[in-house]
Amino acid sequence: MAEMDDNVVYVGKKGIMNYVMAAITQINKGEKEIHIKARGRSISKAVDVAQLLKNRFESDVTVENVDIGTDEVEADEGGTINVSTIDIAIKKP
């Protein structure tokens, strides 16, 4: 099993505030930079998490970098499908 990074919040099917609170927890632990990552339909939720974090909860954080890409995932029927990805780097001074 892959080891989870402490400074990464993986966005999925849960509510947005769960991920915002996870990011705030990482910042309060002393992380200077966190990454909000998502794939597919969760990309818009990851953007919402970053914006809520920046505009409502931690006004001194900045969006350092946004990486977009594509992952190849094995389909249930065989073969591969392309899934879009996003990685939003948030930095606290």
Tell me the role of every PLM-derived stretch:
Residues 1-3, 28, 58-60, 80:
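A generic structural signal for short, solvent-exposed coil/turn residues
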Residues 1-27:
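Histone-fold modules and their flanking histone-like tails across chromatin and transcription assemblies
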Residues 6-8, 24, 31-35, 60-65, ...:
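Beta-strand-rich binding-surface signature
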Residues 10-14, 37-40, 47:
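Ordered, soluble secondary-structure elements with a strong preference for glycine-centered loop motifs
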Residues 28-44:
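Short glycine-rich, basic-tinged beta-strand/loop micro-motifs
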Residues 42-69, 73:
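Short, hydrophobic/π-rich interface segment
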Residues 64-93:
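C-terminal edge-of-domain segments
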